[in-house]
Amino acid sequence: MTSKADTPINAENGGVITKKDLVRMFWRSLPMEFSWHYERQMHMGFEFMIGPALKKIYKDDPEGLKEALHRNLEFFNCTAHVSPFIGGITLAMEEINRANDDFDASSINAVKAALMGPLSGIGDSLILGTLRVLAVGIGTSLAVKGNILGPILFFLIFNVPTFILRYVCAIKGYELGANYLEKVQASGLMEKFMLAAAILGVMVIGGMTNELVVAKTALKIGSGK
């Protein structure tokens, strides 16, 4: 007997991803930042997170799997704790790409780029800028007095909510992608949706380039005397 965790969530539309696959993605999101580097930042961590699910989606299509793995090695940078949300949406779009020859695969990276900025803004401010500071404050105030509860409370206050958030993001990201994108495609609005995502993605990458890339030239433009 097949358990609910082994039943494809979007089976009615030909999907193959199960809840067990998403739970596995959740666990594989934990080392997201282990391979961070300046060129593409978290792209290898993102690939590691969704890799097994991609192999399942393109099980009988080696060339499609190769393209999907290459496609998802593009630049990626987002608060690690909410990255499974983007991973879930990406898997939903990869399933659509696998089933529909007319689907524009480049839109997958456009949607990823469009989501990185807004989710990072929320994640950095709430998780790293608020929850982490709160956990450090409580933990440190006890630790300086020699109370063993200091590091324990820091560990629990910061990690329990973020673990739950990662899990919820993995599940809800895929469900949103599977349900919403199928409806958008059926309504004929997919092209407009992808155009909007591409424009937003270019804006996000442009803003990040402005912040991260520094170029100096010998040419100086003066004003006045």
Task: Name each model feature, range by range.
Residues 28-33, 70-75, 107-120, 182-187:
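Cytosolic juxtamembrane amphipathic/interface segments immediately preceding
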Residues 106-141:
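Transmembrane alpha-helical segments and their cytosolic interface motifs
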Residues 130-134, 141-225:
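Membrane-embedded alpha-helical modules
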Residues 1-104:
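Soluble N-terminal domains of membrane-associated systems
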Residues 37, 122-126, 196:
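Hydrophobic alpha-helical transmembrane segments of multi-pass membrane proteins
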Residues 76, 125-129, 159:
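The structured alpha-helical core of multi-pass membrane proteins
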Residues 45, 85-94, 117, 121-124, ...:
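Glycine-centered flexibility motif
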Residues 101-115, 213-224:
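Hydrophobic, membrane-facing alpha-helical anchors
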